[in-house]
Every structure is written in structure tokens, then in C-alpha cells.
Swiss-Prot record:
Quaternary assembly: In the presence of PdxT, forms a dodecamer of heterodimers.
Binding site for D-ribose 5-phosphate: D59, G188, G253, G274, S275
Protein name, per record: Pyridoxal 5'-phosphate synthase subunit PdxS
UniProt catalytic activity: aldehydo-D-ribose 5-phosphate + D-glyceraldehyde 3-phosphate + L-glutamine = pyridoxal 5'-phosphate + L-glutamate + phosphate + 3 H2O + H(+)
Organism in which the protein naturally occurs: Desulfurococcus amylolyticus (strain DSM 18924 / JCM 16383 / VKM B-2413 / 1221n)
Length: 335
């Protein structure tokens, strides 16, 4: 990005943030409950997640896995009670991880520690913030407590990441205070196809909006925002930037170094890897290979080297998404 473009980006982002904060104050004036809690400035939140760009965040369930992730070069870990594949197999209600496990992971490694909360469950999120995690994932992998309303993330000092299958979903989550977006994909399947579909859908709409902006057709951007129930200012900023105004990671079904390189090639800023590493039979080598391929995704020789580090025979057993029932699709949760 050119220096001039960077200044324009920061100016537009600052303007947007002030408007979002004004909206928060308006909600407070209208009587909506807004606890008097310490909040970090949006730029601090965005600054933290920006430092994760180009890296890999790995799902873990214990300190031993977290140590493997750190030694492999991960930029962070995401602590769960069960890996997405096991959540899918176990059924029942999936909740946030055991606080003791999160604390053990935090004391075992030096890289940022994240954790998931259920969609709409403000007090799981508050517990995670009190524990001191660096990033909260309001995740469709866990069982939602509210299918129609997400957490008001402006009330937290900890940055949030949310999943999205489309640009309107992504912009709605950003409007709610998400500092980071990721593709939803279809977690726990070892099949990257849905993540590919989602990032292409997002990219398609961004390309379209950017075309409107370059042609001076702001009315078309306004129509898009109204038809898709997203704030016009966010749609306009996205159109001007030609990308999402926050960091956008890939997630859902990434199981090999080649999968990670593919998502980076499609425009992701980094990747989350869920079950793909620790449901495989070669987690240490696979973790190193995925980090290598993510870092050097634009160098085919290095991606080949990374792919040689893993064995297909050791890969997690994948799930054919076409055989899943509609109620089994996690990506449908919380739109």
C-alpha cells in the first residue's frame, strides 16, 4: 500500500470509528444497558489484530498442544474444550473452554491466547475478558444462545473476531464492533471448499463496490447497503479501500499446507487452523508445514517444501459436506 493510500485509509477509518462511537452513545441515551466498563480504543484493538497478519492461529485444547503450536511458529492459539471435529461428533451443547485450561495455556506459552464464546453469550465473553485472553472469537462452532443477535462488542476492551460467509455478514459484524473477520467455512470437516466459497463471495462483492466507487456511482453503493442491511458508511469505506476495513483471516476446513497457501492466494490476511493439525497423526510436522506455507504462500517452491513435510495418510479423516444435514451446518449459525 502506498504511503498516501495508507493515510487515506487511516482518515477514513478514524471517521468511521467516530460514527460508530456516536451510534453507541445514541443507544446509551435511548436507554439501552451500557455497563460502565473499561474499553480499549478501537485503534488499539485493530492495531493488535493487525500484528497477527500473515500468520497462523491454531486451535488447541491443552497446554501440550499450545506448546507445539508456539514451537511451530504460530502467531497465536485458540483454546477450546473440544476441537471442531470432536464438537461435531459429540453433539449436545458446546460451550466455552474450561477457565483452568485457558489459564494453564496462558502460563505455558508466550504467544497471544484466544478463546471462543457462544454467539450472543455476553457473560461467557466477559469471563474470557476477565481471564485475560488476547482475542475473543464469537463462534458458530459453539452452540449459539441467540440466533438473531450478536454481542455488542464495543463494550469490551478485548478485540473480537467473527465469522462471515459474505460481505454483508462481515460488515454487520464490524458494525457490532468486531476487530477482525474470518471466513466461516465448515468447521471440523477437513474440507476447505466452503472457506474458498466464502472468501470468493466476499471478494466478488468488494470488487463490485470498488468498481462503483471508481466510476463515481455512490448511489449504487447506497442501494447495496440498503438491500443488504449494512451501514452505508461501512459499504462506502469498503468500496474505497477495495478490501475489508479490518483484518480478514481464513478459517474452516484448512488441513494441509497447500490449503493454507490457497487461502492466502485468494486474499486472506492469515489463517485459523482448527481440527486439521491436532486431529492428524503428524501434528508437529503439519503445524510447521502450514506455518511455512502461510508465510511463503507466493513461493511455489517453498509451498512444495511445506507440503512434503506432511503425509496424506496422516491427515485427519475429512467429512463430505454434501452429506451433512442442514441442521448440522455450523456456518448457518448467527447470520
Amino acid at each position: 500500500m502506498k504511503l498516501v493510500d495508507a493515510y487515506v485509509f487511516l482518515e477514513e477509518l478514524g471517521s468511521l470509528l467516530y460514527k460508530l462511537l456516536e451510534q453507541r452513545d445514541k443507544l446509551r441515551e435511548e436507554g439501552y444497558p451500557v455497563p460502565g466498563r473499561e474499553v480499549a480504543t478501537p485503534l488499539v484493538k485493530y492495531g493488535f489484530v493487525s500484528m497477527l497478519k500473515g500468520g497462523v492461529i491454531m486451535d488447541v485444547t491443552n497446554p501440550e498442544q499450545a506448546i507445539i503450536a508456539e514451537e511451530a511458529g504460530a502467531v497465536g492459539v485458540m483454546v477450546l474444550d473440544k476441537l471442531p471435529y470432536d464438537v461435531r461428533m459429540a453433539g449436545g451443547v458446546a460451550r466455552t473452554a474450561d477457565v483452568k485450561v485457558i489459564e494453564e495455556v496462558m502460563s505455558s506459552i508466550t504467544i497471544p491466547v484466544s478463546a471462543k464464546c457462544r454467539i450472543g453469550h455476553e457473560f461467557e465473553a466477559r469471563v474470557l475478558e476477565e481471564v485475560g485472553v488476547d482475542l475473543i472469537d464469537e463462534s458458530e462452532v459453539l452452540t449459539p444462545v441467540d440466533e438473531k443477535a450478536h454481542i455488542n462488542k464495543w463494550l469490551f476492551k478485548t478485540p473480537f473476531v467473527n465469522g462471515a460467509r459474505s460481505l454483508p455478514e462481515a460488515l454487520r459484524r464490524i458494525y457490532e464492533g468486531a476487530s477482525m473477520i474470518r471466513t466461516k467455512g465448515e468447521p471440523g470437516t477437513g474440507n476447505v471448499a466452503e472457506a474458498v466459497k466464502h472468501i470468493k463471495i466476499v471478494n466478488r462483492d468488494i470488487y463490485m463496490l470498488n468498481g462503483y466507487y471508481r466510476n463515481g456511482d455512490v448511489e449504487a453503493i447506497w442501494v447495496y447497503s440498503k438491500e443488504n442491511r449494512v451501514p452505508y458508511e461501512l459499504a462506502l469505506l469498503t468500496a474505497r479501500l477495495g478490501r475489508l476495513p479490518v483484518v480478514n483471516f481464513a478459517a474452516g476446513g484448512i488441513a494441509t499446507p497447500a490449503d493454507a497457501a490457497l487461502m492466502m492466494w485468494l486474499g486472506a490476511d492469515g489463517v485459523f487452523v482448527g481440527s486439521g493439525i491436532f486431529k492428524s497423526n503428524d501434528p508437529e510436522a503439519r503445524a510447521r508445514g502450514i506455518v511455512l506455507a502461510t508465510t511463503y504462500w507466493d513461493d511455489p517452491e517453498t509451498v512444495l517444501e511445506a507440503q512434503k513435510m506432511v503425509s496424506e495418510k496422516a491427515s485427519m479423516l475429512g467429512i463430505d459436506i454434501r452429506r451433512l444435514k442442514p441442521e448440522e451446518l455450523m456456518q448457518e449459525r448467527g447470520v
